[in-house]
């Protein structure tokens, strides 16, 4: 079967004929392997005649051996001479003596069998498991069809009317008869008629029945196939039996389950042949039914069948389910060849695009390439001798390896891969030892450190794979973060400290005020020890500007001169158009971590990735060198306790004593006392910290480390030398006894004990958070994985209105931040001069965005993913700029997965806690990760706000017991809301309020917003609420990533009135399919269907996708497959997961059809090319 040739995959029920057609023979005996000869038993579960030979090209009896007998069927033992691999694909079958039901269709929720027969699952169970009789045909008797009779009632009826006068039965045979009688078309018509007149629960039941009936009607499935006469037996190599060293056998659970079925089936056959009494046969049939149930889905009904040690056996369903199931273990993530892993160590001398690969690892990974090269160069005569040379590690092998490796990028990956920068490509450099060397600037992206982390190496094999690795994945090209477009390769720690040390200046040091004729002379003076690196000096500089040599004297320091050597001098930090600025150094300020980020950002936007990566390497080298020379180190004498600490302490203690006195006299409540004590100590801690900071010298090493952003923070310095302050107890409540000591002074026993609470809670939180955050990422990926940039422009005219996001008076996200990298949806006009700032469908860059904000425009309509008209994926115009390259997005970019990763990756940085506001009930605000999850799952939030359903004027009445808010609408009617005790009101008397606005403080239920205000309002709400959570934690995520996910949550509509369409009321359907259906009907003059947009949580939305493969590999595998099989669903394979599952190239990036037929011309390059060459920005030519 050619993998890339088919376009869709269909699933359906298997008919008995189909199962027999798949099968190579019937399994008649429960035997597996003969324990003496260790050969499979004939007609057993491992029979060679049915499933194929155990050894390649060898039949069971040994009459035919060797390849030359290929395809012959042995006349003695009946085994075909072929490869043993066929035992992975050949199936068998078991002919059942009595039909049995398939547990998925009878027991699943809702029971499909029950719905189509209009019987309750309870009644069905009684019939199937031989507890009751079912009337199949009452004939002339007063009995009803499908009536249940127990043993006693059946006897009485038989005596009363005679056994032949009506037909009743039990077990799957009876159900099968009923299913065969069903006329789907007629049933469908009847149900549709009934639907028109029914209401309430009855209507819901009819719709659910109709769904099942329509599924069968539209697919090729027949209802009676839910009952099985034949059971397929999966190939033996998929349920292996292996001998352990002790001579015992280990076997797959499936073999036990199959054996039970075969045993019971054979016993039933025998009983039927003997004509055993009805009750015994019935019991045996029930046991057969139970055995088949256990085989298909053990534990779904009743107690599961257990193996040794009371462990439930793994059935066929369990083989698909969960993390260890077929989907997630073997199809979505496979182990690959040409890979290895080792510990990482730092490689400070590497270039940005290089990594160090241990020699022995490289030899093993590149073995085939080395062998080929050895034969080509004539060092070995054939592949076999080349292999021998490599295995014996002869000397010339190393030279060949060097050559092979020189142009061959490798990919490094560190688990957990939280975003796409967790896999990057590097050019390997052979190193001694057994550790991989990693460039220090690549650590941030990988979140790696060198305390024992391990990383995996993968070798891209084909020319195409190598090209993609080099042009798209090379570390030197991945300088920006895809989530917010800021640089990810910002130097850290020592490098920052070195840069800070270089650019700081000091008064009154050796050589201050000296002047030098040029930079070289100044450097020489520094090297000879004549001047200090921080001394303010004058230097004469020369520079060619517009073909003229300009010279002049500037004031600077040696450090700044050295630092500026590695920085391009045209980044725009200095306005060169002003006279006298032409010669100034570009970086003439103190450089900390923040400023470094700005320098890299400007360099990238001005000069592109290649120059930036070269600059980064220079900054790295200088940073390490000068942080070493500076000898900045930490000692206890650097932590000076502020002299006025004692004074501040006694002040605070007096204040607290005063508060306690007031409480004891009954002036204030206990809650108030607690709040006041806490605030007193918080203020005191702040005062001590300020006193400490004022007291510190600018050149204090600890201060330098914190100020530069290399390590540590103000709060840590406060704890070292000020006071530790207030701590929280395990429940998150603040303990009112502060820790007065600092680490410099040392903690006493009680203080130490109090501070352990917080530390332990921090550790527990982190562990829980990681799992929660990972699961959130997984759901996000699943809901948005098929969003790919598929068109250039969808032609959407409707835009999405954005304005700044505020929380109270604080701007969380400014308008310009929201506009950069987007296209406009209509002209943007200056409110004062009325000139057009940006035309419709024009790209907004940073300058335009800032200008729009400056002239006072408050709201702008932009092209957004929300309003994109593409049925699959999005278009480039609606998406805008690719954050990772700062250019327009290219076709085929997997923006859905990038969005999911950008939201999920910072998840671990969010807090877990629910803030308790001093024990007041009902006002706990969920924040951090749980809040994000609550929003994306569209759950009813904790701490619900009461929302007004109408617009009008507010009137508040307060009685002794409660407050009531009345809202008078324009039409004169009043709506009242009871306000629960303890909620704070957001509205005042006489205010006007809009529909959907909050009356009390708290979070709004998004389902209320979509109901009252509509779909755009809910999109806006979700977007700004998620942004608030992330921004409060200091995490920047671009809006477009959230838009992609929220769009997936609002893609489905719920049909309310089906009009003249085929749609059923109450069903969920994709908004684009819904429009198509209506268009068809309207063209023929019919009445269109009515529907309203549904808001689905990400889990629901991921399960509601068109692709059953994607949904089944996500969650609730059996439920998804049951549903898909009945509908005879066809998977169009448009998303990424489906294609990975079946092993096709993913339809994103170069796997898109438009890129499929590109030929790659092998470039002939000089080996050991310069840096610029390896990271050159060639693009793959179309």
UniProtKB/Swiss-Prot annotation:
GO terms for biological process: DNA-templated transcription. Zn(2+) 1 binds at residues 59, 61, 74, 77. It is an enzyme of class 2 (transferase). It holds the Pfam family RNA_pol_Rpb1_5. Mg(2+) binds at residues 449, 451, 453. One of its GO terms (molecular function) is zinc ion binding. Binds 1 Mg(2+) ion per subunit. The keyword NADP does not apply. Its EC number is 2.7.7.6. InterPro entries: DNA-dir_RpoC_beta_prime (IPR045867), DNA-dir_RpoC_beta_prime_bact (IPR012754), RNA_pol_asu (IPR000722), RNA_pol_N (IPR006592), RNA_pol_Rpb1_1 (IPR007080), RNA_pol_Rpb1_3 (IPR007066), RNA_pol_Rpb1_3_sf (IPR042102), RNA_pol_Rpb1_4 (IPR007083). It catalyses: RNA(n) + a ribonucleoside 5'-triphosphate = RNA(n+1) + diphosphate. GO terms for cellular component: DNA-directed RNA polymerase complex. The keyword Transmembrane does not apply. Its cofactor is Mg(2+); Zn(2+). Zn(2+) 2 binds at residues 794, 868, 875, 878. Keywords: DNA-directed RNA polymerase, Magnesium, Metal-binding, Nucleotidyltransferase, Transcription, Transferase, Zinc. DNA-dependent RNA polymerase catalyzes the transcription of DNA into RNA using the four ribonucleoside triphosphates as substrates. The RNAP catalytic core consists of 2 alpha, 1 beta, 1 beta' and 1 omega subunit. When a sigma factor is associated with the core the holoenzyme is formed, which can initiate transcription. Belongs to the RNA polymerase beta' chain family. This is DNA-directed RNA polymerase subunit beta'. It comes from Clostridium acetobutylicum (strain ATCC 824 / DSM 792 / JCM 1419 / IAM 19013 / LMG 5710 / NBRC 13948 / NRRL B-527 / VKM B-1787 / 2291 / W).
